[in-house]
């Protein structure tokens, strides 16, 4: 599956006539948008968004991280974000939307599918922001020499087929690896939503 790291905010906290958060810079701007932030408990995504919030173009992020002082620059930006009231460090996908709904944080990074489920499936007061999203992916692997090799290969072949990958979009808003799967997602669908008729394609 393909998914992205992005962030969401609680619309009950930032509502009305607010100039609403729309960039990764806004996520780091606590003077403009107050409240505790939720961030992942590891380095993944944090270093990248910190540099982009500090003015580094997305195309240059990994070159900067690979340069002298690049990691230190990113860590300094993260320290600035978390220095006053600290940050909520999450490790599981359900934690960011739960913390947002409970108003334990005003904004949090998250995986897009988890925010989508909370917004569309549960009607949670959350808005997802796509600016500076980081595309990520997960693989399926087969252990060499394990039991039931033939059956495992058949299962793997189906899971990674155009049809199998398209079918996953019925359950979570993560994109298929195969371009050929997109043409199979013909109808608006989302099985977890209240009306079951959500167009998954923009998500």
Language-model-derived ranges and their functions:
Residues 5-7, 13-15, 43-47, 113-116, ...:
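Solvent-exposed loop/turn segments at secondary-structure junctions
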Residues 96-99, 115, 152, 165:
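Short, hydrophobic alpha-helical packing/hinge segments within bilobed ligand-binding/sensory domains
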Residues 108-125:
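A ligand-binding cleft/hinge motif common to bilobed small-molecule-binding domains
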Residues 33-37, 83-86, 103-106, 123-126, ...:
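Loop/turn elements at helix/coil->beta-strand transitions in domains of secreted/extracellular proteins
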């Amino acid at each position: 599956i393909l998914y992205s790291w992005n962030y969401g905010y609680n619309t009950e906290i930032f509502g009305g006539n607010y100039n609403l958060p729309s960039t990764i810079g806004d996520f780091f701007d606590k003077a403009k948008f107050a409240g505790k932030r939720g961030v992942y408990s590891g380095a993944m995504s944090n270093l990248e968004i910190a540099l982009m919030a500090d003015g580094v173009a997305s195309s240059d992020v990994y070159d900067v991280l690979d340069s002298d002082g690049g990691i230190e620059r990113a860590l300094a930006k993260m320290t600035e974000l978390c220095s006053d009231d600290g940050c909520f460090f999450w490790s599981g996908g359900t934690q960011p939307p739960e913390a947002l709904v409970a108003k334990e944080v005003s904004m949090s990074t998250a995986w897009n599918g988890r925010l989508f489920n909370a917004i569309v499936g549960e009607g949670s007061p959350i808005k997802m922001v796509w600016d500076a999203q980081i595309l990520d992916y997960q693989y399926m692997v087969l252990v060499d020499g394990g039991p039931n090799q033939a059956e495992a290969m058949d299962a793997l072949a189906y899971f990674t087929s155009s049809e199998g990958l398209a079918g996953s979009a019925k359950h979570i808003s993560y994109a298929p690896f195969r371009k050929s799967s997109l043409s199979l997602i013909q109808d608006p669908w989302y099985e977890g939503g209240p009306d079951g008729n959500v167009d998954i394609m923009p998500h």
